[in-house]
């Protein structure tokens, strides 16, 4: 196996590993917004935002909202 091919395979494997790690963290929630909105509504039910927000910080907004 040539040295360039081996380097390309190692680099490609590394990039694939990073992509596989980021898929469930970043890309899957972006593709399934409604599912994650429902899940977050269930997870955050009963939490009063003002009670958990540290004083002096901006109140957290909807992470799925677009600017």
Swiss-Prot record:
One of its GO terms (biological process) is mitochondrial cytochrome c oxidase assembly. Residues 1-6 are mitochondrial matrix. Expressed in the ovary, specifically in granulosa cells of follicles that have passed the primary stage and in oocytes (at protein level). Residues 28-67 are mitochondrial intermembrane. The modification Phenylalanine amide is found at residue 64. Keywords: Amidation, Membrane, Mitochondrion, Mitochondrion inner membrane, Secreted, Transmembrane, Transmembrane helix. The chain crosses the membrane at residues 7-27. GO terms for cellular component: extracellular region; mitochondrial inner membrane; mitochondrion. It holds the Pfam family DUF4538. The keyword Transmembrane applies. Component of the MITRAC (mitochondrial translation regulation assembly intermediate of cytochrome c oxidase complex) complex, the core components of this complex being COA3/MITRAC12 and COX14. Interacts with COA3/MITRAC12 and COX4I1. Directly interacts with newly synthesized MT-CO1/COX1. PANTHER family: SMALL INTEGRAL MEMBRANE PROTEIN 20. This is Small integral membrane protein 20.
